[in-house]
A protein has these predicted regions:
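Glycine-rich phosphate/diphosphate-binding loops that line cofactor/substrate pockets in enzymes
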Residues: 1, 74-86
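Mixed-charge interfacial surface used for oligomerization/domain docking
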Residues: 2-4, 12-20, 25-33, 37, ...
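N-terminal glycine-rich anion-binding loop in soluble enzyme alpha/beta folds
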Residues: 6-72
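Ligand-binding "clamshell"
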Residues: 64, 113-119
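N-terminal glycine-rich "phosphate-gripper" loop used for MgATP/nucleotide binding
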Residues: 66-73, 91-97
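Short, charged beta->alpha transition segments
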Residues: 69-79, 104-106
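Short glycine-rich or small-residue beta-strand-to-loop segments that form or flank ligand, phosphate
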Residues: 85-93, 119-122, 136
Length: 173
């Protein structure tokens, strides 16, 4: 732990896992399903994962996703709270209702860890915009800012993140 608290996020930040590992940012992984088989969004840990995913798309098999459930968050947060306070920046509520499950899990764990602080923030962001917000929070953490200072910064900046999207292939949209 680089500071007095743990900064965590979800795999939808569009950054490689190695980056999160280097920055000491624990990640909760989403999954996707194709033909009834579930695959973890592994953020580049498995060199076969991206070719497999794009192979599905090329074969006309569109993946489906599901929100993270309360149990997944509770398990993730429980492990982190054993080590310290947690500031979790969640994937934006405009794309998923998962953040509501994160808030429910946080509430459930408050009784188990009354001495710990667990803050869950709806990033209001997705994709690389989400990644930029988490990256900025990690920079502030590494500069020695407090959990409360970073929370205030994220709450202020999350509405100012400008998202752009482009694709070279339109057949999937």
């Amino acid at each position: 732990m680089r500071s007095g608290f743990i900064l965590s996020c979800e795999s939808t930040i569009d950054l490689p896992y190695s980056y999160c590992e280097q920055r000491e940012i624990p990640v909760l992984f989403y999954s996707y399903q194709v033909d009834g088989v579930s695959y973890e969004d592994d953020m580049g840990r498995d060199p076969e994962a991206l070719p497999r995913f794009y192979g599905f798309l090329d074969a006309g098999k569109l993946p489906s996703t599901a929100q993270l459930n309360e149990f997944q968050y509770e398990t993730f947060f429980d492990t982190l709270l054993q080590q310290g306070d947690v500031l979790h920046i969640a994937f934006g509520s405009g794309m998923t209702a998962s953040v509501q499950n994160a808030l429910l899990a946080a509430e459930a764990l408050r009784e188990k860890y009354p001495e710990r602080k667990l803050i869950v923030i709806d990033s209001l962001c997705s994709s690389s915009g989400y990644g930029l917000l988490v990256d900025g929070a990690a920079d502030l953490r590494d500069e020695g800012k407090s959990m409360d200072e970073i929370t205030d910064w994220v709450l202020e900046k999350r509405k100012k993140v400008h998202h752009q999207f482009y694709s070279t292939e339109l057949k999937f949209y």
